[in-house]
Amino acid sequence: MDESKKISLGQFFTPTHIVKYMIGLMTKNKNASILEPSSGNGVFLDSLIQLGYTNLTSYEIDGDIISHPFVINSSFITSYDKPQYDSIIGNPPYVRWKNLSELQKKELKDNSIWKMYCNSLCDYFYIFIIKSILQLKVGGELIFICPDYFFSTKNAEGLRKFLINNGSFEKIILFNESKVFHGVSSSVVIFKYIKGKNIDNINIINIDSKSPIKSEDIESLGESYYIPRFSSSDVWVTSPNHIKVALDKFESYCKTIKKVQPKSLFDDLEFSRIGSVCDIGNGMVSGLDKAFQMNDINYSELELLNSICVAKAKHLDAFCFSGYTRYKFILDDINEDKLITYFPNFFYEFNNYKDYLLKRYSYNKYLPYWKWAFLRNFSLFSKNEKKIFVPCKERISKKSNFRFSLVDEFIYPTQDVTALYKKENVKESIEYITAYLNSKAVFLWMKYKGVVKGNVVEFSEKPLANIPFRRIDWQLKSEKKIHDDITNLVRKYLSNKEFSILHEINLNLEKLGIKVEI
């Protein structure tokens, strides 16, 4: 199979035992009208036919992989949205916008549904879900297997709102890190959704195993429980209800008074969030780190002046960081002759990687091989103050804390790190904010309500900005004292690394309600 076609069409075919399980979720009779909107190699069709279903329709844009009397070899995206099917089942293509062909991108740009609910940050499978629901009869069932990140990502809010407004989920199977497809690392779910029906509770099957799924007896592999139906387009929490209650209690301590109008009797409460106390930015992009990293040689004074200290994810730990790497960093506009004259060691080292450097993504601008590809948030990172670094992604399957590190002045992050700088006029100390972010409460909140793909938590700007934050009531001497104690304890820990201090920090955080009791 052509690899570029496989990527642009999202051709990852479903194992037969998974198909049989999904068909087993169907409740319609053998004469029901059934659609498979992306047939792929026909595994769903073959299984449905073997089981006696006869009223079948399927779409497959790639005529090279299947020719079948039930298959329409054209794009499902352009099909007519008439409610006509009793059941829709399948494995929609998962393709990020950048991997779509130009023809596919044009098709989406011209599509009214895509323009209403999606954008170029969305995955291709989003529109398959929406169009499938539009083509279901009221009471019809949609059974799909797809990535789980539409439960939590910001770009899927439109999809989540559409799903809430047009029906409800009956069952969701969470595979987490279990391997379902060969060569696919994304965490996937199977869901059953009923159009136009209000189902009060969703049956969750939560499979907590890294082993490959080899049997259609899927429900015996995980924990089964029920949660209330989703009621908003915010992040969908699929954990048991007692965890949701504990998270709600923690969030209640992060609420502050919101003035509706001067002297109003109807003041409301709203969450204070990290985004209200910190400026947040993802790190800069060199495009080829090994070419910019400096070696143990005698660089000239000018070369050293044109370098920066970089802390990468590998340098970060909870509260502290273990070091940095010096990188070449020429800001001035020079030509190659001046590079050779004034930066001879840089030129020699760059020359070893020149072919690769010239092939970097240029962000639609002229990019000399000795320049960084994208100085994202450079002005923020140049502030002369301490800040907090965190890896952009963190696998948490065997961890109980994150790595929010308090980092010294004039150390810069690259693209595998996100930085948080305290906003001006925020009274809480950077040490207090660091302690808060490293708390068990924030770990659990991000685990269940953050942007999580499988067991990997994302720490880009928007997910970080959304974390509830416990502000200090400066009118209360008791809270001010706790804040000051935490600040001093963090400084003490950074000085001597005594683990007993971390326990003291946590005890003080708990006095402010910064805990999740599960």
Swiss-Prot record:
EC id: 2.1.1.72
Gene3D superfamilies named in the record: Vaccinia Virus protein VP39
Alphabetized GO MF terms: DNA binding; N-methyltransferase activity; site-specific DNA-methyltransferase (adenine-specific) activity
Organism: Haemophilus influenzae (strain ATCC 51907 / DSM 11121 / KW20 / Rd)
InterPro entries: DNA_methylase_A-5 (IPR003356), DNA_methylase_N6_adenine_CS (IPR002052), MethylTrfase_TaqI-like_dom (IPR011639), N4_N6_ade-DNA_methylase (IPR050953), SAM-dependent_MTases_sf (IPR029063)
Top-level taxonomic group: Bacteria
Keywords from the named record: DNA-binding, Methyltransferase, Restriction system, S-adenosyl-L-methionine, Transferase
High-level lineage: Bacteria, Pseudomonadati, Pseudomonadota, Gammaproteobacteria, Pasteurellales
UniProt protein name: Type II methyltransferase M.HindII
UniProt record similarity statement: Belongs to the N(4)/N(6)-methyltransferase family.
Pfam families given in the database record: Eco57I, N6_Mtase
PANTHER family found in the cross-reference section: DNA METHYLTRANSFERASE YEEA-RELATED, TYPE II METHYLTRANSFERASE M.HINDII
Keyword DNA-binding in annotation: yes
Gene label: hindIIM
SUPFAM superfamilies, per database record: S-adenosyl-L-methionine-dependent methyltransferases (SSF53335)
Reactions catalysed: a 2'-deoxyadenosine in DNA + S-adenosyl-L-methionine = an N(6)-methyl-2'-deoxyadenosine in DNA + S-adenosyl-L-homocysteine + H(+)
Record carries keyword S-adenosyl-L-methionine: yes
